[in-house]
Amino acid sequence: YEVHTTHVPPGSSNGVIKVEHFEGLYKFLSQRNVKNMILTGDFNSPKQELMSGEVITWGQKVNSRGKVRIAVNPKWKDECTGERWDLAERNIIENHTDLDLKDVFRSQYGYEKESFSWFTNKGVGRRYDHIFCSSNMRVDNVFYDQEPRTRKISDHSPLIAELG
């Protein structure tokens, strides 16, 4: 087994550093040739996952009519386009199958189940913490343990998984 953990910095305060982190992580993982790999950590992404299975990245915006488009963040526009941001984030969060990895939580529950690992000050839930494993690995159980977050031990709920 090869296990990798990461903490992708939040884009709000780090901008292009977040994008570069995703790009570097994707490049590193695509050069690995390992039968059983696990990638886990705080990815500070995605912005939203819809019940339809559509993933909204931080490189996108949703307008009042629900139409999704590439975002242009004036704060980072000189360093990073919305397209680059979207692709970098999506390559790990959504296109992980290119790396022969599966999202452990989604492999068990699909997009019908909502569960969150972090909440904004306004109470908006986000699923920022992920475990990805090689597609040949079995997922026996997976859940977000809300107790450490609700007891204020951490601002994130850990994702617990039993893999085989």
Indicate where each model-derived feature is located.
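Active-site regions of metal-assisted phosphoester/phosphodiester hydrolases
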Residues: 1-164
